[in-house]
């Protein structure tokens, strides 16, 4: 958000901040959230690059479509470990994982 817009909102009584402030997340927790979001985006991109649907990607990853959808949306019930396993199941390698998480 640009400075002018932020100032206008604050003058109208709105409180402006970051998501970590709003949710009360520690720096470590915010890093985990950012990693999950980056990995979810990479999973969608990988699946689409392979020409797979969520159903076919779920079959490849040996899970259900609904669970796979939760992974692609970085649902809070999904662990980072599960997201990584599914990324590898779609053919990603360590280099792709590290590039995704360091971006």
Can you annotate each of these PLM segments?
Residues 50-70:
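Short alpha-helical DNA-recognition segment
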Residues 12, 41-56, 85:
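Short basic helix-loop element that most often maps to the first helix and adjoining turn
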Residues 38-39, 63:
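Alpha-helix N-cap/N′ positions at the starts of helices
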